[in-house]
Amino acid sequence: MKGIEMKIKIGIIICDRYRRCAGGKCLRSMRNREGAFSIYADTEVELVGFTTCDGCPGGNIEYAGEEMVKNGADAVHLATGMIVGYPPCPYIDMFKAFLEKRYGIKVVVGTHPIPTKYLDMHTHLGTWEDDAWKPLIAPTMADEVTRESYD
């Protein structure tokens, strides 16, 4: 509604392969409401947690979800790195389903837009040809200029 300020608190879970990532692309896209954060166009966003899954098969998912909910998270984003890394996370569907069921929280696959270099490589490899990937990558697809700005 116009005139009413809305606020959402989110947590971000990244792939453990990127545990040393400073989170710059995720935070930039959150600030600019790009990629999967475009759904919050007119909403104030507060980050209440940022951690890794703890590596395959995701030993930290249960704890991270619980901690984020305790910190007030309304939604958890599974970082774009989980879908653009090679290979993409084989547990992403399981993580999403678990967090939604266990904590009754909204789970969004993706953070920043898929960089062009990753889109090109995964297109070449056919990684995302299976129809199951379409809804997973959709929130992080963006126009070409935006994708290139995340290369």
For every predicted segment, state its role.
Residues T80-V84, T111-T116:
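Short beta-alpha junction loops
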Residues E62-D93, A97:
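Mid-chain, well-packed structural core segment of small domains
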Residues M6-M68, P88-Y91, P113, L119-T123, ...:
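Conserved mixed alpha/beta catalytic, RNA-binding, or beta-rich assembly cores of soluble enzyme
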